[in-house]
């Protein structure tokens, strides 16, 4: 029997990478950037070139990954999905230099996710999951409409009209779990 497969993005789904990066960035540069400053997934469209360069370079710093916490209720959500029998994967589009730190972070904070279930993939349309949960609208839009897609609400994806793309929107982990349950029930 087919096990219902869930692919979860890491950054901004399992963690709040942007918020933590902004915290460190603001401390270093005496700025007051907030999450709402990011109205586009492409930082270069909503920040100055220098700010975008500095901020994206920080993603490659081990210090960031060492200080990063899981997103609220994400550990509960992952445990709940696994306890319900879903086959849970982490599918992350990441730079190869920080992939080891990210894998270590996932293993430390989500020990129920098997290391073999952590995938580095830039083109998420290649995934063969039943559900994809992501904050990047482009990843969701490019994925087959045969895959249930859940957009984790962030300022940079609010321009995506869920009905136009048949994408569900979730504002928290409780809604993610509820929507995955609905997708599963609709598939049987």
Protein language model regions, located:
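Acidic, Mg2+-coordinating phosphoryl-transfer loop and its flanking beta/alpha structural elements
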Residues: 133-171
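Substrate-recognition element of Asp-dependent hydrolases with the DxDx(T/V) motif
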Residues: 63-69, 74-106
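Structural recognition of alpha->loop->beta junctions
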Residues: 105-121, 163-182
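Active-site neighborhood of HAD-like aspartate-dependent phosphohydrolases
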Residues: 1-52
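Short, well-ordered alpha-helix to beta-strand connector turns
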Residues: 85, 115, 129-130, 146-147, ...
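Substrate-recognition "cap/lid" segment bordering the active-site pocket of phosphatases
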Residues: 91-142
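Metal-dependent phosphoesterase signature
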Residues: 33, 39-79
């Amino acid at each position: 029997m087919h096990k219902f497969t869930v692919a979860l993005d890491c950054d901004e789904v399992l963690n709040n990478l942007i918020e933590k990066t902004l915290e460190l960035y603001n401390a270093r540069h005496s700025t007051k950037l907030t999450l709402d400053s990011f109205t586009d997934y492409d930082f270069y469209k909503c920040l100055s070139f220098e700010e975008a360069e500095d901020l994206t370079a920080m993603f490659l710093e081990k210090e960031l990954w060492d200080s990063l916490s899981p997103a609220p209720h994400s550990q509960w959500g992952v445990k709940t999905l696994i306890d319900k029998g879903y086959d849970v994967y982490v599918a992350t589009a990441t730079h190869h230099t920080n992939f080891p730190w990210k894998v270590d972070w996932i293993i430390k904070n989500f020990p129920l996710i098997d290391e073999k279930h952590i995938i580095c993939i830039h083109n998420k349309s290649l995934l063969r999951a039943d559900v994809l949960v992501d904050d990047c609208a482009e990843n969701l839009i490019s994925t087959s409409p045969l895959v249930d897609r859940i957009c984790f609400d962030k300022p940079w994806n609010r321009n995506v009209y869920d009905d136009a793309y048949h994408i569900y929107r979730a504002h928290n982990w409780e809604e993610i779990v509820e929507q995955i349950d609905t997708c599963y029930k609709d598939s049987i």
